[in-house]
Amino acid sequence: MNYKETLDWMFNKLPMYQRIGAAAYKADLNTTIEILDYLNNPQDNFKSVHIAGTNGKGSTSHSLASVFQAAGFKTGLYTSPHLRDFRERIRINGQMIPEDNVVTFIEQHKQKLEELELSFFEMTVAMAFDYFSK
């Protein structure tokens, strides 16, 4: 698959709340834990800050990423939604994840992603953690 085909698959193939409604809702992290176990728990390979809340998460995240990067830390940033390009969601030191990394992640793990019926969010979190760990 090329990059556009990969994005089409990501947005259209997997169940999303917007497409199938309440059936897509998952009240636990079991599927996320399962995909991260499959990926050898990449989130354990780096320190992280999780920013939660109703408003201001994006601004706060970008500000903290800038501060950490200016202090010399290698800084990964995962945000959503994106404005123009899916790759805006996943960055290291301000640089978006390369298109070929997106394609390669999906190609390498497509069977497992389909098997687990991951939500778009679960899949992109796994992709970000995998990218940050390398």
Enumerate the language-model features and the residues they cover.
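ATP-dependent carboxylate-amine ligase catalytic core
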Residues: 22-26, 34-37, 41-44, 70-134
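Short active-site-proximal "capping" loops at secondary-structure junctions
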Residues: 56-57, 83
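Short functional linear segments
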Residues: 1-53, 60-62, 66-71, 78
